[in-house]
């Protein structure tokens, strides 16, 4: 794992849905920028994912409550533009 204070260099908003956007949506719903920040904060090496789809299955928020996600897509088209894509 890299430095514990990795900061994004830029941010943009998603334009259309993809599997990457779906997972970013799930991390951001739980209060994290992306998988990089989640792994830094929670000190985990693996994120629980659905084997069939590869989507994030379960995330632990900063207040230690859990978010559980379905196998299917959860990010509706009307929510896609709210997803932020961070570049490091």
Swiss-Prot record:
Role noted for this protein: Essential for spermiogenesis.
Protein name as it appears in the record: Meiosis expressed gene 1 protein homolog
Subunit relationships: Interacts with PACRG. Interacts with MORN3.
A GO BP annotation: protein localization
Record keywords: Differentiation, Spermatogenesis
GO CC entries: cytosol; manchette; nucleus
Pfam families: Meiosis_expr
Organism of this sequence: Homo sapiens (Human)
UniProt xrefs under InterPro entries: Meiosis-expressed_gene_1 (IPR020186)
Family, similarity comment: Belongs to the MEIG1 family.
